[in-house]
């Protein structure tokens, strides 16, 4: 069973929980709820995966890459319009979900796509795109907040519509 390391921190915007690999790849990012709730959700999400979650504070040895990723993620949450080079590792998702998430990563900051546009591009239905967005476990880095309803309508967001609206506004998108 491989170890993954998690950390919880506050930004100017919200509380964030990150799970990272030894080499600093973000494999889980959750935000917006109190730390105790974020930890509970994380434990449930990882319950069927073959990883042992450990607090980052218990890690010994070189944490340089992890620390860099954490700092970059803090900056990204506070200023999502400024691109950060943060590597991710997908531990969750079906092949279809991962295909959708790879398309989401191509949407630049400051732009949105509708569920229908993505569905047409991938040859599926809008509802499927919505379900894939809802299954995303890496907030902000897999930018499901950039997917909106028809007529640019603000729709649901796993971490709360208020955070979706905040992220879009910070990227210069008025919804």
Swiss-Prot record:
It is an enzyme of class 2 (transferase). GO terms for cellular component: nucleus. It catalyses: a 6-O-methyl-2'-deoxyguanosine in DNA + L-cysteinyl-[protein] = S-methyl-L-cysteinyl-[protein] + a 2'-deoxyguanosine in DNA; a 4-O-methyl-thymidine in DNA + L-cysteinyl-[protein] = a thymidine in DNA + S-methyl-L-cysteinyl-[protein]. Gene3D superfamilies: Winged helix-like DNA-binding domain superfamily/Winged helix DNA-binding domain. GO terms for molecular function: DNA binding; methylated-DNA-[protein]-cysteine S-methyltransferase activity. Its EC number is 2.1.1.63. The active site is at 144 (nucleophile). It is found in: Nucleus. DNA binds at residues 115, 127. Its main location: nucleus. Keywords: DNA damage, DNA repair, DNA-binding, Methyltransferase, Nucleus, Transferase. GO terms for biological process: DNA alkylation repair; methylation. Pfam families: DNA_binding_1. It comes from the Eukaryota. Coiled coil: none annotated. Transmembrane segments: none annotated. PANTHER family: METHYLATED-DNA--PROTEIN-CYSTEINE METHYLTRANSFERASE (PTHR10815:SF13). This enzyme catalyzes only one turnover and therefore is not strictly catalytic. According to one definition, an enzyme is a biocatalyst that acts repeatedly and over many reaction cycles. Belongs to the MGMT family. Involved in the cellular defense against the biological effects of O6-methylguanine (O6-MeG) and O4-methylthymine (O4-MeT) in DNA. Repairs the methylated nucleobase in DNA by stoichiometrically transferring the methyl group to a cysteine residue in the enzyme. This is a suicide reaction: the enzyme is irreversibly inactivated. This is Methylated-DNA--protein-cysteine methyltransferase. It comes from Candida albicans (strain SC5314 / ATCC MYA-2876).
């Amino acid at each position: 069973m491989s170890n993954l390391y998690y950390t919880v921190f506050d930004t100017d915007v919200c509380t964030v929980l990150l799970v990272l690999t030894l080499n600093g790849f973000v494999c889980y990012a959750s935000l917006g709820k109190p730390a105790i709730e974020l930890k509970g959700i994380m434990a449930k999400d990882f319950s069927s995966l073959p990883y042992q979650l450990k607090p980052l504070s218990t890690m010994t040895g070189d944490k340089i890459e992890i620390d860099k990723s954490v700092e970059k993620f803090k900056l990204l949450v506070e200023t999502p319009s400024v691109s950060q080079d943060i590597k991710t590792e997908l531990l969750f998702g079906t092949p279809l979900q991962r295909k959708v998430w790879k398309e989401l990563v191509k949407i630049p900051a400051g732009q949105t796509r509708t569920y229908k546009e993505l569905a047409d591009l991938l040859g599926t239905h809008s509802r499927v795109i919505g379900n894939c967005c809802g299954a995303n476990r890496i907030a902000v880095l897999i930018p499901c907040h950039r997917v909106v309803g028809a007529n640019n309508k603000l729709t649901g967001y796993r971490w709360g519509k208020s955070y979706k609206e905040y992220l879009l506004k910070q990227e210069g998108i008025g919804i």
